[in-house]
Amino acid sequence: MGLKALCLGLLCVLFVSHFYTPMPDNIEESWKIMALDAIAKTCTFTAMCFENMRIMRYEEFISMIFRLDYTQPLSDEYITVTDTTFVDIPVRLYLPKRKSETRRRAVIYFHGGGFCFGSSKQRAFDFLNRWTANTLDAVVVGVDYRLAPQHHFPAQFEDGLAAVKFFLLEKILTKYGVDPTRICIAGDSSGGNLATAVTQQVQNDAEIKHKIKMQVLLYPGLQITDSYLPSHRENEHGIVLTRDVAIKLVSLYFTKDEALPWAMRRNQHMPLESRHLFKFVNWSILLPEKYRKDYVYTEPILGGLSYSLPGLTDSRALPLLANDSQLQNLPLTYILTCQHDLLRDDGLMYVTRLRNVGVQVVHEHIEDGIHGALSFMTSPFYLRLGLRIRDMYVSWLDKNL
């Protein structure tokens, strides 16, 4: 009995020492976030162990967990929910039931998940999109783009763009009773990346008749050109999303070759001919001073890979690499960033770049925010932070869309 208790105690100590992350002082519900973070890190650790033992790949294990949270398209007395396709792209569609004398607003939402995981069918995203449709009396479309590593870039971008272009067709807008002047593209995390890239493409394509009124980017990931930003250093072992996990997922977006994450961890992954792009992600210029702190800027090292991946220099994959002329036509933009988030500086730099070219930007920064908070809005993983961000997002849409 004593030996069993000792072994159990040692296992508990090992678990705590390996998965414990100190919580910042200003974090609300810190004990709950600590538990969620430990669960996330345990899943990541287990997935990596399984991959190393050749039981299953990392992304297969995590995807299996994500799928446990998928929901059916359940309609209610206010909203009709259906799973359908837009030009072969799976979408979940939310249509208000109450009669409207005028055409409705619409939101096209891209879910997060590091390009590798997730779905609009996830409980949290279904809840968010249903809430948005009901609160705004709006048509909402959740896009289920193809996932890596089964499908590498540009599959995700192409799916997102195809779904949006289909929705913007006059006959489709008429079918769903949507006002073509009141359409928003939104997304969180990697979904924020896709929302950004698709909006850039739509607004700069002269052949697309109807344009987007606004875009909403919630803690978006917009670049990996520089993998050693101040927010990367501060949140290297961060809450929910660590630097190693972020690099793992972004690498799988482009390739299965292990040379890429190895180079990314050392900030040596950009091809030799890409130095001209560094000005678009130079945090020593683009970040507000309070976030630069005493960090010293050094350029990424060129040529660490023995081959070049075109996606690493493509603004469709990394929207912060878009030049100023591509940004000038963008619509009203709402960007939300979180202090305790590895991706914080991506959003902050995009705010600066958009404002520099005259785009109207509303920026809200959550001082006690963490990455992925919108994933924690439903039982049993309920956080007040997630509901707060939901309410900020929907309230802003209601006033501006």
Curated annotation (Swiss-Prot):
Keywords: Disulfide bond, Hydrolase, Secreted, Signal. Its EC number is 3.1.1.-. Disulfide bonds join 116-338. It is found in: Secreted. SUPFAM superfamilies: alpha/beta-Hydrolases (SSF53474). GO terms for molecular function: carboxylic ester hydrolase activity. The active site is at 189, 341, 371. A motif (Involved in the stabilization of the negatively charged intermediate by the formation of the oxyanion hole) lies at residues 111-113. Residues 1-18 form the signal peptide. It comes from the Eukaryota. PANTHER family: AB HYDROLASE SUPERFAMILY PROTEIN C4A8.06C, ALPHA_BETA HYDROLASE FOLD-3 DOMAIN-CONTAINING PROTEIN. Belongs to the 'GDXG' lipolytic enzyme family. This is Arylacetamide deacetylase-like 2. It comes from Homo sapiens (Human). The lineage of its organism: Eukaryota, Metazoa, Chordata, Craniata, Vertebrata.
